[in-house]
Amino acid sequence: MARLYADEQYPHPVVEYLRVLGHDVLTVQEAGKANQKVPDSEVLAFAAIACRAVLTQNRKDFIQLHRAQTSHGGIIACTNDRNWEALANRVDAAIAAEESLPGKLIRVVRPAAPQS
């Protein structure tokens, strides 16, 4: 399973579901970096040093960081989804589809609502 680093705004219920699925998830809060306004570039650098991929819903900024620097532990950029368990399952499936995470940008999107 994957070693992940959840940024400050990442939903804690999703973190808990990912842990149940067997992933090693460290949160910004657990790392002692909460409420410090740590720049995204430093979040990415910390994760790389810790050999972890970043979990984020801050897609725009982290996609830009990936384009500027592909040498990182991986970025999993998710759309917002209040169905925490479904989001965790999509993240898990996206991770399982990859051989490794370093240097990768993985986008996890909420499925479109069914048309009626």
Placement of each model-derived feature along the sequence:
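Acidic, metal-binding active-site segment of PIN/NYN-like and related structure-specific nucleases
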Residues: 52-65
